[in-house]
Regions:
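Conserved NAD(P)H cofactor-binding loop of Rossmann-fold oxidoreductase domains
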Residues: 85-90
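Catalytic loop of short-chain dehydrogenase/reductase
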Residues: 130-167, 179-181
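Substrate-binding pocket helix/loop in short-chain dehydrogenase/reductase
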Residues: 93-94, 101-106
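Conserved glycine-rich cofactor-binding loop
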Residues: 9-10
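Conserved glycine-rich Rossmann-like NAD(P)H-binding loop of the short-chain dehydrogenase/reductase
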Residues: 25-39
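A glycine/serine/threonine-rich, flexible loop-to-helix segment
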Residues: 176-190
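The beta1-alpha1 cofactor-binding region of Rossmann-like NAD(H)/NADP(H)-dependent oxidoreductases
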Residues: 35, 56-67, 99
Length: 190
């Protein structure tokens, strides 16, 4: 089996990649700026006996995301799982959101997953898509993250729509974790 994970070099994306590799999955790992972390993760994946290919792209440019998924499908033509984990999270209260922040949030958090999934389903006969959401979008708790919340709400609605539209060939799910990043001064256990 094979999986492709955006934002797979660090944190939750890395944990998903390592978990799947332990189970024998081959991994396509996306990163943007974290080459050292991506190479380290690749080495760890290969220690489990799984294949790992690295893919670099700025998901803030949706066409670059589509070009990347084309390369992923060359390496993994029968891709079983695509995980849209990469996201940007900018402080942006409604009164201060500018076009640049708004576009970046939607390009990375919504448009790139949209068009990558579209390319995936048009080039594979079956598979699984997992969109990483955020628990904050259910209750509107994070009012200082207007553009982020809107982009994740759009991704949540896309998840629901595609789960219906693409079944039974493709299973589409969303996972909405709570806070997962450790404090820069904290330990892994904290």
């Amino acid at each position: 089996k094979s999986a492709f994970i955006t934002g797979g070099a660090k944190r939750i994306g890395q944990d998903m990649a390592l978990h799947l590799a332990k189970k024998g999955w081959d991994i396509g790992l996306h990163y943007r700026n974290s080459l050292n972390e991506a190479e380290s993760t690749r080495k760890r994946i290969e220690e489990y006996g799984s294949l790992c290919k690295l893919f670099c792209a700025d998901l803030g440019k949706p066409q670059a995301a589509v070009d990347m998924i084309k390369q992923v499908l060359i390496e993994f033509p029968k891709l079983d799982l695509m995980v849209h984990n990469a996201s940007v999270f900018d402080v942006s209260p409604f009164a201060t959101v500018n076009v640049e922040v708004f576009d970046r949030q939607f390009d990375v958090n919504f448009k790139s997953p949209f068009f990558m999934t579209q390319h995936y389903i048009n080039n594979c006969s079956k598979g699984h898509v997992v969109n990483i959401l955020d628990t904050k979008i259910q209750s509107n708790q994070a009012t200082h993250f207007t553009a982020y919340n809107l982009s994740k709400k759009a991704l949540m609605h896309l998840t629901k729509m595609t789960a219906l539209d693409l079944a039974p060939g493709f299973r589409v799910n969303g996972i909405a974790p709570g806070p997962v990043l450790k404090a820069s001064h904290g330990t892994e256990d904290e």
